[in-house]
């Protein structure tokens, strides 16, 4: 099976107005993707997805498409799909561009799974976790009452964990967290995500003010580059700390571990440049006694499927203890995948079909690119 054609599709999806995310890193009312289709001489197609947010990774739709079409495609055309590991190494020769490289890797692994007639999680080590994964719901910087109402509704729907964005307005942040804790009760897991919006000194002060709300952990309290500051926050506040933006690469993970800056590390295929590299970070963290968690960049169905396979194959992803952020499709009204990812009662189902397990309709992808309406399909079953 050889690669014969590679296509890219720029897609823009509106986030549901009642749920779009605002954080210390900015607003996220619209999601931009690049969908990758790798086609073979045997008629198979592998699908990948890059969720590009310049404020997050520095990548853009135009840049991702240029990199794939002008650089990666010439490397991959006429190559054997079975040589996917070597092909991924070639793609990794380009610096940075983590989400773009992850999209190409997803498409290759999707093809390998289809060729072997097995799900991707079997290719990367087999299922080490249950195929029904506990997830949490994330709420942006909204008014305290609105945030509390959304959180209470999600708990009624079956979520057992809630994440709240905080950072730019300490007093309103405090009221927001207080309102949510009151609305969801003491038995629901609650954490806050600062998205690097605090200095180390401010983080220590604010975390102490949050002690009465029984937070499970604080995510990325300091800027991504300030790993020493995050270590100071962890030591002086006594809070459990999760590193997210600070860990794009395995070298950054090593630094976080060496400086004892985090109790948990957030991984996911896009941020880490692919499923395989995210798994390596997970294995490194496990050797250091640090649990891994899956974060999110509001992925669509393809990227969400990749996250599911990673979570299933990594025993150090303890979603039973720390429900994960596999939640992107919940934030969109339209789901043009033929068989969308299935969510139910605060859980997501890992696809078990061959490859990533998400079938894509090219006409519907084209319709989204052109900005036309696409028939919505329910993702709840």
Range-by-range predicted roles:
Residues 1-45, 50-55, 329-334:
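Structured beta-strand/loop patches that form or line metal/cofactor-binding pockets in enzymes
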Residues 331-381:
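C-terminal extensions of enzymes
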Residues 74, 208, 214, 225-242, ...:
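Shared catalytic-loop signature of beta/alpha-barrel
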Residues 95, 105-140:
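Glycine-rich, aromatic-flanked loop segments that form ligand/cofactor-binding clefts
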Residues 46-48, 133-139, 162-164, 188-194, ...:
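Hydrophobic faces of well-ordered beta-strands that scaffold small-molecule active sites
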Residues 125-237:
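Metal-dependent enolase-superfamily TIM-barrel catalytic cores that perform enediolate-based chemistry
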